[in-house]
Amino acid sequence: MIRFVHAIKIGETGLIATLHSKTVKIIFVAILLASLSPAFGGQRFVHAQNGGVTLSAAAGFDGYCKDKRWLPVRVEVENTGPDLDASVQVSYQNSSGGITSTTTEAQLPTSSRKAFFVYIFADGSLRDFTVSLFDGKKVLQKVKLSANCLADTLLLVGVISDTPAAFDGLSDINPLGGTSRVAQLRIDDLPERYQAWRTLDALVVSNADTGVLTAAQKQAMELWLSSGGKLFVAGGAQWQRTTAGLNELLPVEIRSTRNVTDLTNLSAYVEDESPLSSQTTLAVGTMREGARALVEEEGVSILSQKNVGFGEVYYLAADPSANPLVGWAGMKTLYEQSLATRPPLPPWAISTFDSSGYSNPAEQALGAMKELSMPSILYICGLLGLYVVVMGPLNFLVLRRTKRRELAWMTIPALVIIFSCVFYATGFSFRGFTPIMNRLMVAQAWDGVPQANVKALVGVYSPVRAGYDVTAAEGFMPRAFSGSFGDLQADNQWAVLQQDDSMTLPDTRVEIAGMKALILEGSLPALPISHTLTIDLGKTPSSVTGTVTNASEFTLKDAMLITPGGWKELGDLKPGASTDVNLFLTSSSSSFYSSNAGNILNINPIAIQPDVEAARQYSFLQAVLSSSDYSYMNAGNWGVYLIGWMDRSDLPVGIDGRRYDRVDTVLYIHSLTPQLKTEGSVLNLPSGFFAWESSSPLVSPYSAFEIPDEGYILRFKPAMPIQFRSVQSLKLMLVSSNPSALTAYAWNFETGSWTRLATDKMTITISNPDQFVAPNGEARIRVVQDQSTYTEITSTTITMQVIP
């Protein structure tokens, strides 16, 4: 596979003439293959140059990228000439007709070679881009690359392995509502900033030396996992080199190997009848806290799983490239169950702060500043009244009393000038004297993850017409805001200077009393939030109970606890304070996520307009909950969250070389992972205990207003893995305005087909439930509508009872 595009120096043509004819043929074939390589995800560009400098670049993950994601470009520069103070720029023409570019410095002493990443945001129009090497303003070399930017519905799986052929089946897995692609990678293809990892949906590592992972790559991987990524690591005989750099992330602390002669339980887990009876080597150890064994054989764990934030880590103790797993058809099902499920994340985790609607709450939040609002009507009326009184009656009375009424031709212009200065000074003082950064942040943290992912919307307000250099440090990466405040630089340009862990937007132009905005992504240390929450599945109804403690130094203002069944207001949670929780999991609607910010905050949007801070919180929360045009339909999913406002001002973004003021609004969200109690003869799994996934963005378990012609499929899976022997009961709640127009089906895992269900009742009890539930607890429901009639569906949820 051709990974890098090289610009090389070709010698004298006489040298070619002296080559042996066989060598010439080899070179010709190599050039031919390079010219054909775009069909295979790569590309080769040859550029003759002088000066002894070689430039190489590779795009994305094996040439793949995704729209509205960061693209990592790996660059290698080699200098065999004199010392060179160069810069490398990655650029492309954006959708507005301007140039989007990222530039970084490259100090190149003689006989040196440097490799680094340059990061650029793909705005939806990126297909071809250029990597240029500059000496000042002089272009030394230029390399042209192409990127295959995939739709977000496509599942991109990266593979790092010395035996990549064993993972060919990954391209055949079928995620719900999409297809998959496989990117063959090396360790040095992995970027050092987690924002650029988000193009990858999953990563498979087997028979590869991960001990060479840098600390930055490891941290980026952990943050990517917490954002929803999935990591699949295989053991086997070469487990030591495979897990050398991943040990802390694995659900198992591996200590030794063990030979077994049968993997029948793994076959049963994926419901594949193929025998797995040959001897194989397992890399085994002890389960870590919070990890779960999904498949066990002869007393040892074969397949285990561990949650990391929104993501998951799977560990397979056997080697897929060795017998009996090599060529086994069941691996496809195993990969699908592990990697192809993508339950929707909460809206704040995927919000872009953009909106195609008439009103963008993000812009309203940015504009909620006293400097951008009108002065008080009383103040304006009072000033105008004073002007009228002084100019008219008072001026006349004074002149008449002094018997100098002929001076009116002088006093009236003088008063006009004086009051004009007063009005101007009033307006100038009202809009302020220093620039202000309106910084709106939402921070998402998780149990056991030291860093919180932060997404920030930052507005730069200026009282005068000026240009500012805005710098984001500590790994934060800026991208354009598509709202009316988003045109930061002239001629639709978006130029970023990248240096170490910082990025700078030079010459951000702001008009008088105007504002420009940008979006930042990065991470900050998480607050120490502790809890004793548990879910007892042996009780009916199931609920989340326990205590939540704020062990941080910050007060969480207007805190609330959210579950799939609703939310509870906790008030201000001060440092060291604790609160008791008891909330049901039963859910017939995503009540929190379908509510607007006014209902959640208990405020009237119109009444709060004079209160700038309350108006800013209201608009920002509305923007956070509006992840897309259809977010009100499908935003609610599994999750227990502590939410509150806090005073935190450590966002590492500011204006270089200028004094500025800050207005910080921080919404802090901590995902709480309850302990699971599975005591009792029967476990009750309520609707709120399932994580769901839909084949259509227009459909959720709680709403389906626009049903596709082919119907929709909902995949339900227990949010926390549980082990059970059999299924005692499976019920479907299908509530609609016209039940006779609907046909419902359940997926039969034994026959591999859809079974039609009776829909004469809102609660449908499914017979022989064991056939319709996979060993991992997954169930699938399909609903088709008679297109000749209108139907509004308000519930497609399931409940389950299992025997542990």
Model features per residue range: what roles?
Residues 104-107, 112, 116-125, 583-586, ...:
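Short, hydrophobic beta-strand segments
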Residues 105-114, 572-577, 756-760, 772-773:
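Short proline/glycine- and polar residue-rich coil/turn motifs
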Residues 126-209, 237, 241, 322, ...:
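Aromatic-Pro/Gly-enriched surface loop or interdomain linker
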Residues 168, 177-180, 195-196, 205-298, ...:
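A glycine-rich, often tryptophan-bearing local segment used as a flexible ligand/cofactor-contacting loop or short
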Residues 199-200, 226-233, 285-389, 393, ...:
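A glycine-centered loop/beta-turn motif at secondary-structure junctions
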Residues 364, 369-372, 452-743, 748:
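Accessory, solvent-exposed terminal regions and/or long lumenal/extracellular loops of proteins
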Residues 427-448:
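Alpha-helical transmembrane signal-anchor/signal-peptide segments
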Residues 759-791, 800:
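Cysteine-clustered segments with highest specificity for TGF-beta superfamily mature ligands
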